[in-house]
Amino acid sequence: WRKAFKLCPPTASQNMLLNGMTLIGKEIVKTKDAQVRAAMIDTVLTLNDLRAEYYPKYAVTAYNSKGQYITQYFKDPQVVYDQLNKIIEINQEKVKPSLLLLDLNAAIELYKKSAIGAEDVINTYQNAIALLDKAGNSDDNAKIRSDIEGLFITSQVASCDNLIALFTPRYEADPDNMDLVTNIVKMLGSTEGCQNNDLFLNAVTKMHKNEPSASSAYYLYKLHSAKDESETAIKYFEEAVS
């Protein structure tokens, strides 16, 4: 195979690239020499890049394959995070769903080491969920989504303080951005003990003004009641029952 790969251009045969991945993959398992192993891993990743470049019809598959090799061969969360982010950026909603989960896991590991901030982890999580939404419903996507949400919640990165610190300047800069407002309500609303703050109240109020409903009016009544703002609470209660 090595002779054929050396003599023939990548366009000679896609199977030549695929066979190379298989053969070298077996050799990687056997070798004990760290330097040789690193070179072999680099070759496998390069073969995936060549497949994506010269056989664009299979580019998505090639990059997803590369992502799997990266998570298989690299244990450094920084390498995994950086490399998977590149693949996710290219493949978007066509990325293999499990890579989104592994990318978030790497982000959380880096956060624990103070290598990245909470905002980076939250952005990684939100991007993963957005891509799964675009990809559509499937059993695989639903399971991965559940795993991603579970991992994110148990990581405790999305503390109320972190969310408020992240979203307050965004809201102040663009208070009429309904996508942002909806996101704030969703994120803070699903975080335990994160509904009794001005950011959440302002976002819910903005959503209600944009799309008034009896349920949102009643929710605002409850929020203002909790803050002992009786006059405003009564106003929303009357709106809810009218």
What residue spans do the PLM features occupy?
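Charge-dense, extended regions
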Residues: 223, 232-239
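Preference for long, solvent-exposed alpha-helical segments and helix-linker "stalks"
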Residues: 2-219, 223-227
